[in-house]
Amino acid sequence: TTTVVNYTAKKSYCRRAVELTLGSLGVSSELQQKLQDVVIDRNALSLGKVLGEGEFGSVMEGRLSQPEGTPQKVAVKTMKLDNFSHREIEEFLSEAACIKDFDHPNVIKLLGVCIELSSQQIPKPMVVLPFMKYGDLHSFLLRSRLEMAPQFVPLQMLLKFMVDIALGMEYLSSRQFLHRDLAARNCMLRDDMTVCVADFGLSKKIYSGDYYRQGRIAKMPVKWIAIESLADRVYTTKSDVWAFGVTMWEIATRGMTPYPGVQNHEIYEYLFHGQRLKKPENCLDELYDIMSSCWRAEPADRPTFSQLKVHLEKLLESLPAPRGSKDVIYVNTSLPEESPDSTQDLGLDSVIPQADSDLDPGDIAEPCCSHTKAALVAVDIHDGGSRYVLESEGSPTEDAYVPQLPHEGSAWTEASTLPVGSSLAAQLPCADGCLEDSEALL
């Protein structure tokens, strides 16, 4: 008998094929040359689910095969070719060519560029970047504020985000690189919660919500653009400083849209008449002074990124150290108030939301009373002990119920400083089981 062996020849990397594919994109020979050492073989990249999609393109999850080792999880940015000219494709890839040599912990690193042929045999460019577990900073801030179970983000962490961005922008400005699109949406959160500056002009090809087209001028993120850039379309490092100030405001407000109530087409007149972003609620005066310095009318009067980094680091160092090694967790729920006519007994299951049922019950005070009227209770759980802050409708009265303190020797005090959190109509009583003085962070 004759043995038949079927096999598939191993695919080899063909430089000539890559050159032809890049050339078919219609980009310049100079750009083709720049991209040669970052081109990724399409067979090494597998695409997964769509992470984000917009008018002009999408971001997909992917896996990049490594010569040795396990595949690397990546993010892949693509363009919708039917919306773009060859010039815009060249701009898309030019940004990738610019960042390929960046090497800084607070600046995203380009992994490569991949060219894929569509079913119509049209070459489609894809930019491959590291996958960021927590996504972009703006989305993270929004989730922390608006999700069903909001996550408390301490002021120290917010300031650390700002310092990270300042470090990244200091590096870019030292290399005479203009970002021109700095915003919280264009900063990414690594697995260790450090921030890296990203999307050097790539985001406007994919996300269009924050961009505004005026006449025949290309879409611009006008609420982040410096006043001189709006007037004359002139960009300098000091224009990036202006955008950094707006980004600081975004972080301080945990993802709010700048200039609430002001339309895109009204921004220039608003700024021209001396108006600026208002101080966020519960923002430290020192922090607002730093961000305000970024919005001075004369670019030369604005600080450098090196100066901003120093100011922010000093402010961060002046704040009290975190109280525990673990992140502060806040559980917001409603506890019934005392009612003399009710003897209903509530267990812990009715106090702890389902999402937080794995918390140690010993760290949460069990309610000892009930009433149809609810009071908002914020429970701060950390390594050093537990704090209980109660907020009820109206002002406290003399006969108001005072909850039992969690530890012997604890006493009710008035919170006098609230560096982070929502505005409060009145000071709240707080019970602290810690032996030393501390602040209530809401």
From Swiss-Prot:
Subcellular location: Host cell membrane
Protein name: Tyrosine-protein kinase transforming protein RYK
Entry's Gene Ontology cellular component terms: host cell plasma membrane; plasma membrane; receptor complex
PANTHER family noted in UniProt: TYROSINE-PROTEIN KINASE MER, TYROSINE-PROTEIN KINASE RECEPTOR
Active site, per annotation: D181
Annotated residues for binding of ATP: L51, G52, E53, G54, E55, F56, G57, S58, V59, K77
Catalytic activity line of the entry: L-tyrosyl-[protein] + ATP = O-phospho-L-tyrosyl-[protein] + ADP + H(+)
UniProt modified residues of type Phosphotyrosine: Y212
SUPFAM superfamilies the UniProt entry points to: Protein kinase-like (PK-like)
InterPro entries the record matches: Kinase-like_dom_sf (IPR011009), Prot_kinase_dom (IPR000719), Protein_kinase_ATP_BS (IPR017441), RTK (IPR050122), Ser-Thr/Tyr_kinase_cat_dom (IPR001245), Tyr_kinase_AS (IPR008266), Tyr_kinase_cat_dom (IPR020635)
Family membership noted in the UniProt record: Belongs to the protein kinase superfamily. Tyr protein kinase family. AXL/UFO subfamily.
Domain Protein kinase stretches: 45-316
Additional comment: This protein is synthesized as an Env-Ryk polyprotein. An Env-Ryk precursor fusion protein is first synthesized and then cellular protease cleaves this precursor into gp85 and the putative oncogene termed gp69 (gp37-Ryk).
EC number(s) reported in the record: 2.7.10.1
An MF annotation (GO) of this entry: transmembrane receptor protein tyrosine kinase activity
Single GO BP term: cell surface receptor protein tyrosine kinase signaling pathway
Pfam families for the chain: PK_Tyr_Ser-Thr
Bilayer-spanning residue ranges: none
